[in-house]
Amino acid sequence: MEKAKLTKNLKLKIKNAQLTKAAGLDKLKQKLAQAGSSDTKNSPASKAQTKEKSSKKTAGTPAPAPEVDLGATESTARRIRAKDRSSFAAEPTVTTALPGDASHLTLDAIPAIKAPEITSVTQKEQTLRECTDTSSVQQEEKKESSEETSPETPERIEETPIIRTRTEPKSVVSIKPKFGPTGKHINHLLAKTFKAPAKETKAASTEETTQQQPRQNDAASHNNKQQPSGTSSRPASSAPSYRRESTSNNNNNAKRGSERDRSKRSDESVKAFTGRDRYGLNEGSSEEDKWRKKRVHKTKKQAEEHVVQCPAHIKIALPITVKDLAAEMKLKASELIQKLFIHGMTYVVNDVLDSQTVVEYIGLEFGCTIEIDSSAKEKLCLVENTVRDEVNATDPEKLIIRSPIVAFMGHVDHGKTTIIDALRQSNMAASEAGAITQHTGAFKCTTPVGEITVLDTPGHEAFSAMRARGAEVCDIVVLVVAGDEGIKEQTIEAIEHAKGANITIVVAINKCDKPNFNVETVYRQLAELDLLPEAWGGSIATINTSAKTGEGLQDLLEMLALQAEVLELKADPSARARGLVIESELHKGLGAVATVLVQNGTLHLGEALVFNDCYGKVKTMHDEHNQLLQSATPSTPVLITGLSAIPKAGDPFIVVKNEKVAKEIISARLAGQQRSAALQKKRPNFDAVLQNKKTLKLIIKADVQGSIEALAHSILNIRSEKVDVEILSSGVGDISESDIRLASASKATVIGFHTSVESHAEPLIKNLNVKVCLFDIIYHAVDAIKEIMTGLLDPIAEEKNLGAAEIKATFKSSQLGTIYGCLVTEGTVVRNQKIRIIRDKEVLWKGSLSSLKRLKEDVKEVKKGMECGILLDNYQQAQVGDILQCYEVIYHPQTL
């Protein structure tokens, strides 16, 4: 039992020593020991005398042996022996043979011994020592109490040194390595616990063998100083045991000292890699540097940031964002923004800089020369000259005569497509929805006077963009005017397009077979538009035609051939192909297809094309009869496949070296378009929010690109101060599942023009409650959109007075409340209508009439001059003399 108690005491001392060293209290203890040794009051001699006096008083018998021994050690009282003994070693116990009455005196003197008070220690240091030695003092108190209750015999004391001297440095090594709460390895602290100067250790070991008694007294005094005030001292039996230490114990202590020296030297010579090394806490010379973590990587980063400098010369393309420009200049975006703000220009990191002057000024401020890269512009515009300029600059020997491109233009239902059918001997007009042309047709037809390339343009007002493209592409414009109706709005628009493009105009006055045909009216209208006909002495050729009877068609062809001969239309078939997109669509089996018209050069199968925002490689090429072609000569319209996307109608195209070059060009163009789009980013319409305007959101799908343009143009032209129209997206093809989901999320209406709904998207329309409208005729679509816009407007409420009654008396009812006896003074009071109470020309209440009675019978209405009983709905504050007005609320729909 005593062995386990001693082992536990040893572990507690080891732990206390570790904590003392970690808290830096070992130095404090050394200072306290020095202060105590220098103090005369706390000298070993005085303490021994005090102990002797107290023992004499208690026992009543003299004790000469302790008195003589303590006097002999008076000269060595100031020697400190703290370094020669490890705090982890067991306390030495000496086996001696005491005199006859010595043991009796010692056992009786135990309760009378008290620890001397240390006067040289401040209260703060004393409290700190109490905290660190609490566990050891408690163990000593338990030990003293056990010794007081059961005094041991001298034979028992002789057995204790064998048990208490088994402590070796191995007990320190057996402690499991672990990290403390600060992340430092505990081995570092253990290695420092045994540190002591080598010279002092050697001197202490020599003095242990020669001068045992002074060392024992010093150690006893040192142990007494370590005890805090207020605690009991060691038993008196320990004093004589120190004086009678055997030589065997001296040998054991010397061995333990040499082992500790070897362990210290091994720790100092070979230092293990600990957690402090991992976290960089062992670097530095001073004690504070060892506890401070060195963050080398952060200091390196800061040094690198200061090293980075702005380059002297950079090359960029405009437009460019502030963030991208700062990255090119190796600067922070905040520095550029600050510099711009100082000079009165407010920008954020995502704003776009498109001014060359501003960009060059920024570079000048930071000492950087900025060069604008124009190679992107060269890719954006492959050729600067037009097709006509290119033909005029070509060697005349390479030029050949090409067939004329003729565009038939005019008002809707004036017979353009019918005349073309008569020339081609086909029936295209019957296949058009609503018997009106809504697409641009391009095809070649063989006539007795040669081949003619015909463009059939829509006549509806919504297709002005198509008519404009037709006027730009063609060589001759055939202006079709109905002789019975004369010139209309779209006819005037077609004339303006032709004049703007400086194109020859031939007027075909159609429907000459009708009885109300009046050619003079048409001549007069043409003259008013500065188109003086040849019959009136002008230069404009006019021909009377009839598509039904075929009258005048041959004369029309001859006139076209004559005009083409006068124009001397030529082209270079050996040049690379250039032309325009007439129409484009998304085919289910072929993908993106486009009808293109070759204006110059020859287009071959397998060549790479570049459009405005897409590219392609010609995989197949068909004519209007769906025959496969290997090449297309000038003035030939063909249908091509193999495109990366759907090109827009009217986009020019040109042949490039290969598909790789075409892809690079389009990538550069798309990057430029994104930067331009950032400049023209749509701002929210705060005016519409303040005015509380309704917004109709639309998703448009059509069969061809031209139809989308026409429909969007017509929708945006609907003027309304109450409703705005916003087109969320538009595309070519059938209405897909993604379109339905987008419409559901944004609460939009889907408009389909000449298209249908995909099969797997139809169930979503009902599940998500999305409104989908399909149209084949454009003006039907426009009318339907106007109705939808009108439906968004809240109806206007109008109050119509029906009659009035005056309250003559009031009657209280426990079940119904207040019943008003009234006389109808005006009109008719009708049940289930609205009532307002008026007093002194002010409306007090508005509500409904819940009950109307006449002579205890429920009636629907009471006319003027009759009395009735009226019960109001949840109102009982009316008085005699108030006027009850009966009125009806009528809602009227608003108009755009």
Swiss-Prot record:
<feature type="region of interest" description="G1">
    <location>
        <begin position="410"/>
        <end position="417"/>
    </location>
</feature>
<dbReference type="GO" id="GO:0003743">
    <property type="term" value="F:translation initiation factor activity"/>
</dbReference>
<feature type="region of interest" description="G4">
    <location>
        <begin position="510"/>
        <end position="513"/>
    </location>
</feature>
<dbReference type="InterPro" id="IPR000795">
    <property type="entry name" value="T_Tr_GTP-bd_dom"/>
</dbReference>
<feature type="compositionally biased region" description="Basic and acidic residues">
    <location>
        <begin position="256"/>
        <end position="280"/>
    </location>
</feature>
<keyword id="KW-0547">Nucleotide-binding</keyword>
<feature type="compositionally biased region" description="Low complexity">
    <location>
        <begin position="203"/>
        <end position="214"/>
    </location>
</feature>
<comment type="function">
    <text>One of the essential components for the initiation of protein synthesis. Protects formylmethionyl-tRNA from spontaneous hydrolysis and promotes its binding to the 30S ribosomal subunits. Also involved in the hydrolysis of GTP during the formation of the 70S ribosomal complex.</text>
</comment>
<dbReference type="Pfam" id="PF04760">
    <property type="entry name" value="IF2_N"/>
</dbReference>
<comment type="similarity">
    <text>Belongs to the TRAFAC class translation factor GTPase superfamily. Classic translation factor GTPase family. IF-2 subfamily.</text>
</comment>
<keyword id="KW-0396">Initiation factor</keyword>
<dbReference type="GO" id="GO:0005525">
    <property type="term" value="F:GTP binding"/>
</dbReference>
<feature type="binding site">
    <location>
        <begin position="410"/>
        <end position="417"/>
    </location>
    <ligand>
        <name>GTP</name>
    </ligand>
</feature>
<dbReference type="GO" id="GO:0005829">
    <property type="term" value="C:cytosol"/>
</dbReference>
<dbReference type="GO" id="GO:0003924">
    <property type="term" value="F:GTPase activity"/>
</dbReference>
<dbReference type="InterPro" id="IPR006847">
    <property type="entry name" value="IF2_N"/>
</dbReference>
<dbReference type="InterPro" id="IPR044145">
    <property type="entry name" value="IF2_II"/>
</dbReference>
<feature type="domain" description="tr-type G">
    <location>
        <begin position="401"/>
        <end position="570"/>
    </location>
</feature>
<feature type="region of interest" description="G5">
    <location>
        <begin position="546"/>
        <end position="548"/>
    </location>
</feature>
<dbReference type="Pfam" id="PF11987">
    <property type="entry name" value="IF-2"/>
</dbReference>
<dbReference type="InterPro" id="IPR036925">
    <property type="entry name" value="TIF_IF2_dom3_sf"/>
</dbReference>
<dbReference type="InterPro" id="IPR053905">
    <property type="entry name" value="EF-G-like_DII"/>
</dbReference>
<dbReference type="InterPro" id="IPR027417">
    <property type="entry name" value="P-loop_NTPase"/>
</dbReference>
<feature type="binding site">
    <location>
        <begin position="456"/>
        <end position="460"/>
    </location>
    <ligand>
        <name>GTP</name>
    </ligand>
</feature>
<dbReference type="InterPro" id="IPR004161">
    <property type="entry name" value="EFTu-like_2"/>
</dbReference>
<feature type="compositionally biased region" description="Basic and acidic residues">
    <location>
        <begin position="153"/>
        <end position="169"/>
    </location>
</feature>
<protein>
    <recommendedName>
        <fullName>Translation initiation factor IF-2</fullName>
    </recommendedName>
</protein>
<feature type="region of interest" description="G3">
    <location>
        <begin position="456"/>
        <end position="459"/>
    </location>
</feature>
<dbReference type="InterPro" id="IPR023115">
    <property type="entry name" value="TIF_IF2_dom3"/>
</dbReference>
<dbReference type="Pfam" id="PF00009">
    <property type="entry name" value="GTP_EFTU"/>
</dbReference>
<keyword id="KW-0963">Cytoplasm</keyword>
<dbReference type="InterPro" id="IPR000178">
    <property type="entry name" value="TF_IF2_bacterial-like"/>
</dbReference>
<feature type="region of interest" description="Disordered">
    <location>
        <begin position="117"/>
        <end position="304"/>
    </location>
</feature>
<dbReference type="Pfam" id="PF03144">
    <property type="entry name" value="GTP_EFTU_D2"/>
</dbReference>
<feature type="region of interest" description="Disordered">
    <location>
        <begin position="32"/>
        <end position="99"/>
    </location>
</feature>
<feature type="compositionally biased region" description="Polar residues">
    <location>
        <begin position="35"/>
        <end position="48"/>
    </location>
</feature>
<dbReference type="InterPro" id="IPR009000">
    <property type="entry name" value="Transl_B-barrel_sf"/>
</dbReference>
<keyword id="KW-0342">GTP-binding</keyword>
<feature type="compositionally biased region" description="Low complexity">
    <location>
        <begin position="228"/>
        <end position="241"/>
    </location>
</feature>
<feature type="binding site">
    <location>
        <begin position="510"/>
        <end position="513"/>
    </location>
    <ligand>
        <name>GTP</name>
    </ligand>
</feature>
<feature type="compositionally biased region" description="Polar residues">
    <location>
        <begin position="215"/>
        <end position="227"/>
    </location>
</feature>
<feature type="region of interest" description="G2">
    <location>
        <begin position="435"/>
        <end position="439"/>
    </location>
</feature>
